[in-house]
Amino acid sequence: MQFFSTRDTNRKVTSSEAIAQGLSDEGGLFVPESFPQVDVRALCELDYPALAAAVIREYLTDYSPEFLAQAARTTYGEAFGGKAGYLAPVEGDTYALELWHGPTCAFKDYALQLMPKLLVEAKKNLGRTEKTLILVATSGDTGKAALDGYHDIPGVEIAVFYPTG
């Protein structure tokens, strides 16, 4: 699948390029050129790691399905203590989706535990070896989740900025 810039629809890149670059050269965001149709009923039968891999595979078509399955299984199995996407029964047919089972107890762990693996693989897919610096500005739990996710990732450093006051 190709991704295009929100500021130049003629600028198209692969998913690896979009992930490795972050923002387009003209400052736009990369968005998918289409939204794949998925069989929701089939997804309901999957555990969270398999569901995540199945959905992501539709968008990151230049990544191997085996890599995506392993990355999702490792991320949402270990870091989430087996409770990723846990639906806690409330009453009758009512459930609550618990999003705090990640390593920093922030819902942002869902993205920020997987994204470092995707970035490293994107750079590998593209033959890029330069160091990547991730800059994060936040006033909340995004910083801790990002720091935890990118901790000890080879070829990647991260700096988090918090406002004062």
Predicted regions and their residues:
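PLP-dependent amino-acid enzyme catalytic core
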Residues: M1-G165
